[in-house]
Amino acid sequence: MSSASAPGPAPACLTLWDEEDFQGRRCRLLSDCANVGERGGLRRVRSVKVENGAWVAFEYPDFQGQQFILEKGDYPRWSAWSGSSGHHSNQLLSFRPVLCANHSDSRVTLFEGENFQGCKFELSDDYPSLPSMGWASKEVGSLKVSSGAWVAYQYPGYRGYQYVLERDRHSGEFRNYSEFGTQAHTGQLQSIRRVQH
């Protein structure tokens, strides 16, 4: 009798179009793409379909600028990925899959101060409002992702700038707000949720 092992997760895959509503030229990505113009021949990206996995999209080449989480599904125009973000971007120019080794047991610890100092709080669930759950400050000085991948937002209700925080990048350690992302100018985080695969 042979034993069949369970299949692993499907590889990350997304398709990009240079026009809204999945029109125009397209390009399929299966791995990191630092510049979709050079690799895929697209001058801009106006619609996206995530077929497998979760992805982080950046408004500039080389994984720079505002981050946008793209989970499985269709994004027919810029408003679908910008949502209620405080920053609206009608262009996405670099992409990478989210590294998420252990989503089923996601854990993150928030710290009041930089370098993991001060009051701390461990989370294992989604929180649409950190202040309402007892976090006294509007800011998070540092954080450690023990497992999984998270997306933190500037404001309650999953609004404002997005920061994708993964256990498998930076060893899960973000010593100060500037390590949250290239666009991070403040440690203001007021809601956080697990990345959905």
From Swiss-Prot:
- What is the top-level taxon of the source organism? Eukaryota
- Region N-terminal arm: which residues? 1-11
* GO biological process assignments: lens development in camera-type eye; visual perception
InterPro entries from the UniProt entry: Beta/Gamma-Crystallin (IPR050252), Beta/gamma_crystallin (IPR001064), G_crystallin-like (IPR011024)
Query: What is one Pfam family matched by this protein?
Result: Crystall
Sequence ranges assigned to domain Beta/gamma crystallin 'Greek key' in this UniProt record: 12-52, 53-99, 106-147, 148-196
Q: Does the keyword Protein transport apply?
A: no
**Keywords (A to Z) from UniProt:** Eye lens protein, Repeat
Alphabetical list of SMART domains matching this protein: XTALbg
Q: Which SUPFAM superfamilies does the entry mention?
A: gamma-Crystallin-like
Which is one GO molecular function term here?
Answer: structural constituent of eye lens
Entry annotated with the keyword Isomerase:
no
Q: Where is this region: Connecting peptide?
A: 100-105
Record-stated family: Belongs to the beta/gamma-crystallin family.
Q: Note what the entry says on domains.
A: Has a two-domain beta-structure, folded into four very similar Greek key motifs.
* UniProt subunit comment: Homo/heterodimer, or complexes of higher-order. The structure of beta-crystallin oligomers seems to be stabilized through interactions between the N-terminal arms.
Cited function: Crystallins are the dominant structural components of the vertebrate eye lens.
What's this protein's name? Beta-crystallin A2
Origin species, per record, is Oryctolagus cuniculus (Rabbit)
Q: Which taxonomic lineage does the organism of this UniProt entry have?
A: Eukaryota, Metazoa, Chordata, Craniata, Vertebrata
